[in-house]
Amino acid sequence: MEVFDYENVQLIPNKCLISSRSEADTSVEFGGHRFKLPVVPANMASVIDDKLAIWLAENGYFYIMHRFEPGKRFNFVTDMKQRGLISSISVGVKEEEYRLIDELVDAGLTPDYITIDIAHGYANTVIDMIHYIKKHLPKAFVVAGNIATPDAVRELEDAGADATKVGIGPGRACITKLKTGFGTAGWQLAAVRLCAKAARKPIIADGGIRHNGDIAKSVRFGASMVMIGSLFAGHKQSPGSDLVIDHRHYKQYYGSASAKQKGVYKNVEGKDLLVPYRGDIANTLNEMAQDLQSSISYAGGNNLQALRTVNYVIVQNTIMNGD
């Protein structure tokens, strides 16, 4: 098996066919809707809240609301429906999550997107939840994860998942690799490639994104969407706490399996970090769009499809060369 990660890969340029980078179309169709970018902020409590979800939906970006305030999800779906915006929530697999599905059914509410979000998504509990959602809310687009292997992709798709989310512990706030010895840290991009080759439906590459160019690499190796945590955690709209240390502004960023999120030190596989403050999220999204337009121009096309066929090289150590 060929193993590599984002820092080990460089894409090889093709002849540019557009007059200006601005001609490149970065939009993507996902689940019956078209979004401006193939990126989605991580569904983590320190990355997204209801206010940011509304802003993203209003401005043409995909989002997935986190599941860590379970009592608010029903009202969140109701509010988004009333606003005429896309509704996208996360659920787990415990008994109370089934009750939420029942409440939505009873109220005649179908979220546009439901993401089944647990650390090890290749599980019977996830398959059972897919079956339940598809039986009772058949029009919802179901994303299931997180997973790491082609077998997992095939089984979750066969169960009814409309998309799968790939990545076990490659993110900055995750320490699954250290606590358990398992995961895709260090080979996340190769895992995306393996899973995409097996997939008949879209996949979301989740975790390990350190630079904007990693978005293009994810698309090259088969991702329809790219989930990003740390790069989206430092904005004025980010829910994490603001801190100033030695006159430098930071935002708090913590993993979904961290003691901070759990409220107790039990089965901890995440950590609490500080990330530099980055201002308005709109500026970051604009920069990502511009960089992705440049990527498309290097690929020799005018849309994301051009990225999927470019050649690449694997370098020995890292493309950063000490930078």
UniProtKB/Swiss-Prot annotation:
Keywords: NADP, Oxidoreductase. Gene3D superfamilies: Aldolase class I. It catalyses: IMP + NH4(+) + NADP(+) = GMP + NADPH + 2 H(+). One of its GO terms (molecular function) is GMP reductase activity. CDD domains: IMPDH (cd00381). The keyword Oxidoreductase applies. One of its GO terms (biological process) is purine nucleotide metabolic process. Its EC number is 1.7.1.7. SMART domains: IMPDH. The active site is at 174 (thioimidate intermediate). One of its GO terms (cellular component) is GMP reductase complex. SUPFAM superfamilies: Inosine monophosphate dehydrogenase (IMPDH) (SSF51412). Pfam families: IMPDH. The keyword Transcription regulation does not apply. NADP(+) binds at residues 203-226. Catalyzes the irreversible NADPH-dependent deamination of GMP to IMP. It functions in the conversion of nucleobase, nucleoside and nucleotide derivatives of G to A nucleotides, and in maintaining the intracellular balance of A and G nucleotides. Belongs to the IMPDH/GMPR family. GuaC type 2 subfamily. This is GMP reductase.
